[in-house]
């Protein structure tokens, strides 16, 4: 079949005259930027003129960085002379010979660098061709295939950060993890003035960059680094958002500092600094606060109960990131250093209902926990490209944690089974190191080949101690069991992988990709649990694995359509050793996984359709899961192994469709997915009715599946485009399987069917600097059990309210939001109530806009609460957390640098 395909392409080659696209660039030899008014002439070896063109601007990172020309010439060996000329520059020449034709369809030539004529000075205006555009109130428009959001057209409260702007942009969604979706598609990474900062961590950039510095945000598709380096056009491109700063901040150092003090011991101190030039840029920030959040009133009214700040959190954050590039971006280095120290005080009440065949078991818990987690991360990326690609990535991560907690809980079915009081302390440290090297190049005949080497090392240690008191109620007298235990767990692991790829270019837009990867991993775990001496729950475990992963893929592109199919075979062998007390066992397991995947999409100017489907292994059992051993270190939670446990696998399918009218009047986004799980690993629960303890054991079950559908519409209303209406509807369904039983009944399967239906709507109006929005939504959660377990839940969450910001007399800005939250159908009666959440902020600027004074009040009615509800295959859990207290704060913000 392979020979047949190749021969068919050869025949096609002779049947029609082939051409090759010659691509080159013209830049200023000193500034290394594009010359926008250059003219390029293609001549034969005897200086006969073949063709001539004017250069066009290329914006691979959303900014004008260089200018490009291209010619289509016959696909044959020949020599050409390229002449480039521009006003105020010396004419430049380049001789280029096509030595290898093969299956090449595009050849990138050396860059032509023109020198200034001596009679002229450096006229930066001719080089940069900067265009000054007067401010417009149009929020968004298309420039070719690039979607541009005009930041000045939006109305935000003073002191807002970039994330506030993104939440107001039409077609944009921003979740709590910092993931950005534009018109239904996820942004792969965010750049700042064309430079990627903080290793692509969107959250760090958007929550620290002041909104007032932003000129516009550009959303576009960009060639991947590998393809750009080799002069290829990517078939699956990165979806990028580039934040363009205003002129006064783009080539200058600027700094923003904010400090605030409030009631209830609230405080805030924050500083942001940045510098950008044509070749390098950097940003730095410091943020210290005990506010749990960065949100300002009047943003978008998304201060929902599920996302409300739970616990009391004090954050200390810092970061430094920079990028340097030269030679038209062919040499680029990026680095980032960040730190995050978080102190959390948590108080929670939890009601858990475990599903049992002869009556459910209830567990009530009260817990107080003080936690400190410190995270530090450093990364460095070096990239060299043209005529090949070489990438090196180094990353170091360190985490240190401390935890002190006290809790009390009681377990009961029809009568109280036990009452427990527990005090626990814990310290942990983790260090991870990783190094990756990627090299890719083209053969003279147009095929691509590449290699990748990657190595990781991790080590960690957990030390903990606990004091537990368990009371078992009896008719005559309570039985008290009390113990003190200390535990020390060490973990060391490494892995490395070697990967090779060859991409065979066929004619007609087809390619064959063949790859092979070898990986080796080793993990050691030592657990020493001490009461008075080393007890039976101490162990040593070691897992050594080898992976061989050959793969073959085929992709095809024609017009607006693209398809890619791949089959990867994972041949894995694990050698496991487990030592515990008198048990010393050594065994091995082998797995063969077939992992097919399919990607199909169609793109046009106003729509995008995508189908993605893949099958593969999800979870492989750990050595502690498959060894025949018992762990009763917690007398109320006993763990058993299962020697017959198998790996689990799943089939995932996603379908996306987006339609967006280029007039920006209407947009539609539809997303659906289906997940089918096979041999899903769950933990069976056996409840001991005598003492209230549980014995859990990993098991394989079939029948678990889930599906979801999400529909979003957005419409801009009126000729003046002042009104907009957005509606989001989503439906989630899950069919979960669990196993449970008691000491007096046999183990049985529980089939849990859960439905979540939600609808959120927002109507907004903006006129000049006044913005007002009305919003509302309802969410239904329903769960039922098809077996003999008693379970039938129906809960509702309803919210509605308004938010606004506008200018008052004396140049005072007010921003506020008011939202009513209602909950119905929860098991905790105290949860079923109404909460009115209100926030107000007043601000005014002084010293020509350099100084901003703000007065802010949060939760003015003191009704904020934090609730979570989860339903698994074994239980229904409702948890209430302490929330940050209501407070008022006065803050000062000062802008340094040119303004």
Across the structure, where does each feature detected by a protein language model lie?
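Outer membrane beta-barrel strand-and-loop segments of large Gram-negative receptors
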Residues: 364, 537-539, 640-642, 646, ...
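Outer-membrane beta-barrel translocator domains and adjoining extracellular loop/strand segments
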Residues: 230-231, 286, 295-301, 345-361, ...
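Signature of Gram-negative outer-membrane beta-barrel scaffolds
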Residues: 485, 495-497, 509-605, 609-612
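Short Pro-Gly-centered beta-turn/loop motif in secreted/extracellular proteins
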Residues: 63-79
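A short, amphipathic beta-strand motif
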Residues: 20-29
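Membrane-proximal, glycine/serine-rich, low-complexity loop/turn segments characteristic
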Residues: 12-19, 32, 41-43, 47, ...
């Amino acid at each position: 079949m392979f020979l047949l395909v190749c021969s068919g392409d050869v025949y096609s080659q002779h049947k029609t005259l082939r051409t090759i696209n010659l691509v080159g660039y013209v830049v200023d030899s000193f500034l290394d930027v594009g010359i926008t008014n250059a003219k390029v002439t293609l001549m034969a070896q005897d200086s006969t003129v073949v063709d001539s063109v004017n250069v066009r601007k290329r914006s691979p990172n959303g900014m004008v960085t260089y200018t490009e020309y291209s010619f289509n010439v016959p696909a044959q060996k020949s020599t050409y002379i390229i002449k480039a000329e521009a006003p105020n520059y010396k004419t430049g020449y380049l001789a280029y010979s096509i030595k290898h034709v093969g299956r090449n369809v595009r050849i990138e030539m050396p860059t032509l660098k023109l020198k200034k004529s001596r009679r002229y000075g450096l006229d930066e205006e001719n080089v940069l061709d900067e265009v000054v555009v007067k401010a417009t109130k149009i929020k968004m428009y298309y420039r070719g295939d690039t979607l541009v959001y005009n930041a000045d057209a939006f109305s935000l409260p003073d002191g807002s950060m970039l994330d506030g702007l993104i939440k107001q942009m039409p077609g944009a969604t921003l979740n709590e993890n910092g993931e950005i979706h534009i018109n239904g598609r996820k942004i792969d990474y965010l750049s700042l003035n064309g430079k990627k900062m903080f290793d692509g961590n969107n959250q760090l950039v958007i929550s620290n960059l002041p909104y007032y510095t932003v000129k516009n945000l550009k959303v576009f598709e960009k060639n991947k680094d590998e393809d750009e380096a080799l002069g290829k056009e990517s078939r699956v491109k990165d979806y990028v958002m580039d934040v363009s700063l205003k002129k006064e901040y783009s080539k200058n150092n600027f700094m923003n500092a904010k400090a605030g003090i409030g009631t209830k011991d609230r405080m805030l101190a924050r500083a942001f600094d940045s510098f950008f030039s044509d070749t390098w840029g950097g940003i730095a920030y410091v943020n210290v606060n005990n506010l749990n959040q960065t949100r300002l009133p009047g943003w978008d009214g998304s201060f929902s109960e599920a996302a409300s700040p739970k616990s009391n959190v004090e954050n200390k954050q810092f970061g430094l990131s920079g990028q340097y590039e030269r030679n038209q971006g062919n040499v680029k280095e990026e680095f980032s250093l960040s730190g995050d120290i978080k102190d959390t005080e948590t108080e929670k009440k939890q009601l858990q209902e475990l599903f049992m065949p002869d009556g459910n078991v209830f567990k009530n818990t009260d817990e107080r926990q003080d936690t400190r987690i410190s995270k530090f991360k450093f990364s460095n990326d070096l990239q060299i490209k043209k005529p090949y690609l070489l990438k090196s990535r180094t990353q170091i991560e360190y985490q240190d944690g401390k935890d002190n907690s006290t809790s009390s809980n009681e377990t009961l079915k029809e009568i109280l089974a036990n009452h427990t009081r527990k005090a626990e302390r814990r310290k942990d440290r983790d260090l991870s190191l990783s190094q990756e090297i990627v090299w890719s190049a083209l053969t003279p005949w147009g095929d691509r080949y590449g290699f990748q080497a990657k190595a990781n090392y991790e080590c960690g240690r957990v030390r903990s101690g606990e004091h537990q008191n368990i009371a078992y109620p009896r008719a005559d007298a309570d039985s008290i069991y009390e113990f003190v235990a200390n535990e020390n767990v060490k973990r060391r692991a490494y892995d490395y992988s070697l990967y090779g790829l060859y991409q065979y270019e066929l004619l007609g837009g087809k390619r064959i990709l063949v790859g092979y990867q070898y990986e080796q991993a080793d993990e050691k775990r030592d657990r020493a649990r001490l009461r008075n001496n080393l007890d039976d729950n101490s162990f040593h475990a070691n897992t050594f694995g080898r992976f061989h992963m050959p793969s073959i893929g085929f992709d095809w592109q024609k017009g607006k359509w693209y398809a890619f199919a791949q089959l990867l075979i994972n041949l894995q062998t694990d050698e496991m050793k487990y030592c515990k007390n008198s048990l010393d066992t050594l065994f091995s397991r082998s797995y063969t996984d077939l992992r097919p995947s399919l990607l199909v999409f169609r793109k046009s100017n106003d729509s995008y359709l995508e189908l993605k489907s893949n099958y593969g292994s999800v979870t492989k059992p750990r050595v502690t899961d498959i060894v025949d051993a018992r762990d009763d270190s917690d007398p109320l939670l006993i763990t058993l192994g299962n020697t017959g446990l198998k790996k689990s696998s799943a089939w995932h399918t996603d379908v996306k469709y987006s339609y967006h009218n280029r007039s920006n009047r209407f947009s539609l986004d539809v997303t659906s997915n289906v997940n089918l799980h096979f041999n899903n690993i769950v933990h069976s629960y056996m409840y001991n009715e005598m003492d209230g303890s549980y014995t859990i054991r990993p098991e394989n079950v079939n029948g678990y599946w889930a599906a979801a559908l999400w529909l979003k519409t957005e419409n801009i209303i009126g000729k003046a485009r002042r009104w907009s209406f957005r509606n989001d509807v989503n439906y989630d369904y899950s069919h979960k399987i669990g196993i449970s039983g008691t000491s007096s009944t046999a183990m049985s399967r529980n089939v849990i069917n859960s439905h979540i239906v939600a609808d959120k709507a927002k109507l907004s109006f903006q006129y000049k600097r006044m913005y007002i929005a009305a919003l509302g939504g309802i969410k239904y959660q329903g769960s039922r059990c098809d077996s003999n377990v008693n379970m039938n839940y129906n809960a509702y969450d309803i919210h509605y309210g308004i938010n606004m910001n506008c200018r008052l007399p004396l140049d005072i800005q007010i921003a506020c939001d008011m939202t009513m939250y209602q909950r119905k159908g929860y098991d905790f009666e105290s949860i079923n109530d109404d909460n009115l959440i209100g926030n107000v902020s007043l601000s005014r600027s002084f010293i020509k806009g350099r100084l901003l004074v703000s007065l802010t009040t949060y939760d003015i009615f003191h009704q904020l609460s934090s609730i979570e509800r989860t339903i698994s295959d074994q239980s229904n859990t409702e948890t209430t957390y302490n929330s940050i207290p209501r407070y008022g704060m006065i803050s000062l913000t000062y802008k340094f640098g040119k303004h």
